[in-house]
Amino acid sequence: MIGGLFVYNHKGEVLISRIYRDDVTRNAVDAFRVNVIHARQQVRSPVTNMARTSFFHVKRGNVWICAVTRQNVNAAMVFEFLKRFADTMQSYFGKLNEENVKNNFVLIYELLDEILDFGYPQNTDPGVLKTFITQQGVRTADAPVPVTKEEQSQITSQVTGQIGWRREGIKYRRNELFLDVIEYVNLLMNQQGQVLSAHVAGKVAMKSYLSGMPECKFGINDKITIEGKSKPGSDDPNKASRAAVAIDDCQFHQCVKLTKFETEHAISFIPPDGEYELMRYRTTKDIQLPFRVIPLVREVSRNKMEVKVVVKSNFKPSLLAQKLEVRIPTPPNTSGVQLICMKGKAKYKAGENAIVWKIKRMAGMKESQISAEIDLLSTGNVEKKKWNRPPVSMNFEVPFAPSGLKVRYLKVFEPKLNYSDHDVIKWVRYIGRSGLYETRC
């Protein structure tokens, strides 16, 4: 539980202060200001412990948000709450800065009354909060529109009921559902082409514009394994092996019915309205690496070095990768670079000690290469200290999920309103992007 919550500006002045427990005093305000905000050296850790008191902080622009506690709390829970608190404020009055916090301090205190109860986080969904807290960023002199008994009953049932993330009575002229599978590939490969570490961090992002109170359901691969638990969906071992995905860990939105996921390996949920993140997951097995980077470095003499980098695409020829960028490090004593590339454009950036090679598009099962002749300056200091070659890094975007995650079906059920699954316009998109994608040279 959280003992106190404070919001500071960049000078360390307190903009918002709320103490929830007696074991936290106003002295905590000064302790954080002196030891973190006004510290001589930048404090990199988001958690600071002083006098048996823990300070958890995040920074948005020029605003510091700090949660204080003397209890042994779950750090992940505190940071998740701080993130959602900041997102909630942004959803009400836009950019989170000192001026907006001062202009909306009444609204912020009203939000704190709803999202924290005696230090325990409660409802932090902006969509739900906006049903019973004014949406105006700054309070006006005009009295708010009174809430009827019927509206009050609807608000109460939404906040305390089982479906607190969606209000009733939503109507759209056209029912649409968008699903994006977005994955980030992280790779570290040595000079011989051996994978030292690789993992995929993925998420399922959705946009729902559906009328009424529908139930959505989508199925993923024929076979999925989560933390050693196999959920078979096919009796054919060959088919299951081709479609299998081993997920190390995953996290779902509160709307997902976990019991059905355990039994049917299908995700069933009543969706929130608008944009939301339905699922996060991580996998380290059977990753399809979109690209192979092969660097070759040859030291011709003390004053010259030759570099050749080959990029090979490892996916279907019908697919097209975009936004390719390869960064090739150069020694700090580089005086000049001559470049020859088969495709795209390459440029030497002296300020970054790197050659940046950009390719707009590249089809699958293709390869391209770049050659560079690097001229070096002869300096005693550089010759004495050997240059440790940084890895070659790569950025890209591909239209498939490198983990192999597939959406088998996506259905919508709404028994009360007069529309069926066939009346809903549905879109499914796969996006694979580079995280930290490096090859040692």
From Swiss-Prot:
Effect of deleting the gene: Mutants display a squat body statue referred to as a dumpy phenotype and have defective HSN neuronal cell migration. AWB sensory neurons show an expanded ciliary membrane phenotype with enhanced wing cilia and relocalized tub-1 and PtdIns(4,5)P2 to the ciliary base. RNAi-mediated knockdown results in impaired function of the AP-2 complex and accumulation of the wntless homolog mig-14 at the cell membrane.
Pfam families: Adap_comp_sub, Clat_adaptor_s
Major location category of this protein: membrane
Domain MHD, residue spans: 174-440
Domain of life: Eukaryota
GO MF entry, a single one: clathrin adaptor activity
Tissue expression notes: Brain, heart, lung, liver, testis and spleen.
Protein transport found in the keyword field: yes
Gene3D superfamilies named among the record's database cross-references: 3.30.450.60, Mu homology domain, subdomain B
Membrane topology category: Peripheral membrane protein
Gene Ontology cellular-component annotations: AP-2 adaptor complex; cytoplasmic vesicle; periciliary membrane compartment; synapse; synaptic vesicle
Keywords assigned by UniProt, alphabetized: Cell membrane, Coated pit, Endocytosis, Membrane, Protein transport, Transport
GO terms (BP aspect): body morphogenesis; clathrin-dependent endocytosis; intracellular protein transport; necroptotic process; positive regulation of Wnt protein secretion; protein localization to non-motile cilium; receptor-mediated endocytosis; regulation of neurogenesis
Keyword Secreted: no
Compartments (UniProt record): Cell membrane; Membrane, Coated pit
Subunit-level organization: Adapter protein complex 2 (AP-2) is a heterotetramer composed of two large adaptins (alpha-type subunit and beta-type subunits), a medium adaptin (mu-type subunit AP50) and a small adaptin (sigma-type subunit AP17).
Family (UniProt): Belongs to the adapter complexes medium subunit family.
Purpose of the protein: Component of the adapter complexes which link clathrin to receptors in coated vesicles. Clathrin-associated protein complexes are believed to interact with the cytoplasmic tails of membrane proteins, leading to their selection and concentration. AP50 is a subunit of the plasma membrane adapter. Essential wnt/egl-20 signaling protein that functions in wnt/egl-20-producing cells. Required for the AP-2 complex-mediated endocytosis of membrane proteins including wntless homolog mig-14 in egl-20-producing cells.
This protein's name: AP-2 complex subunit mu
Species: Caenorhabditis elegans
Gene (name only): dpy-23
